[in-house]
């Protein structure tokens, strides 16, 4: 990490060198000793630098005294012991039309061409969006269940 904290230099002999950092997170807030790990991650939407930071995270929650049992299924996302059923959002089925169009565009391009590569990038971004929607939905539901109950039993 450079002294201005606007760039990072990789010295692991992979030939990456110096990269400029762009983003919303303020790295001035963390000291160099708190940064434990740095990773380069390539996704369909671009290349990202991930920082692993050693921070104690504490949340003050009051015990609610509630217990709940969850049954995860295929038709419903989950059913709890109180009779509440959460429907499966089916993000893949909702965006099926867009994915079909992207697949058709790829199949019409010449193999090895720049335009086929661009079409593959677009399809990759669509799949990445679906996976992020699924992950976001799962995290939000899990957080809601965990915060509102003290004991959770999963079948």
What is the predicted role of each segment?
Residues 33-37, 43-155:
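Substrate-contacting helices/loops that form the catalytic groove of nucleic-acid
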Residues 1-41:
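Acidic carboxylate diad motif detector
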